[in-house]
């Protein structure tokens, strides 16, 4: 069973083809709009939608040409329906539904977060058994789930204000740095010369619940930098290190609590922030010290991509899900 996946929820245009019977990704194409939005310091929704319109058909032609497949080989077309930028989602959904109608292929709506949650399965070496705890950590979401079976997700905790990735992005703006924030902060943090110069708070780390808060950490960065008389690149690197260290410390602590609370021994990490080297290192240490299994997506599939949508669509399709009509039903916000 072969699925074409389409991702267009924000500023990445992604198409991929996944073979469920072989558990194999056949092809994957991605166009990133980062350069387009970089000069604005963030994603401009109207521009994002227009870029999806311009690139989707080109990527589709490329992916079929390179694989030698045709639409006759496709059993289902999966597309991101929620959450995301409504205009961008509508472009991808309309493209998918149109292809489905023309070629008489079933279509299936996929939740963007479910795609991220399953993305570690794109690693051929990953054999993830249920149940497990999952941390979704990105620019728009920071959530902990207990996953008992496919499609059975229990929310354990989430950010009550800024998502972790959002805090990274806002920190770069406060410090007059570039976009996207996660990469900029991590790269500059690697250049820190005095890792103990700044001590920042760990919001909600010691709270018994599994919720997060990163707004206060962002404000602490602002106040610290405002009070700093020597705003040199060296001190900016030291502050980036302190921020990243605090944010990662909270994420790892909450993951440990979630595993203890649910009595699980398997942990799945996904979303854009899962590419962070310090986060991976600290969670690997946690797993090693406590005997847990930990699963990350391949680095190239941490951010938005069509491969995870094709994968999630395949799992949904074999579980009996598919669209019942041609209605375009996308949502900016939607819980998993």
From Swiss-Prot:
UniProt-annotated location(s)? Cytoplasm
Q: GO MF annotations for this entry? A: iron ion binding; N(6)-L-threonylcarbamoyladenine synthase activity
Residues bound to substrate: 136-140, 169, 182, 276
SUPFAM superfamilies per the UniProt record, alphabetical: Actin-like ATPase domain (SSF53067)
Q: Which family does it belong to?
A: Belongs to the KAE1 / TsaD family.
Task: Extract the NCBIfam families matched here.
Answer: gcp_kae1 (TIGR00329), T6A_TsaD_YgjD (TIGR03723)
The protein depicted here goes by the name: tRNA N6-adenosine threonylcarbamoyltransferase
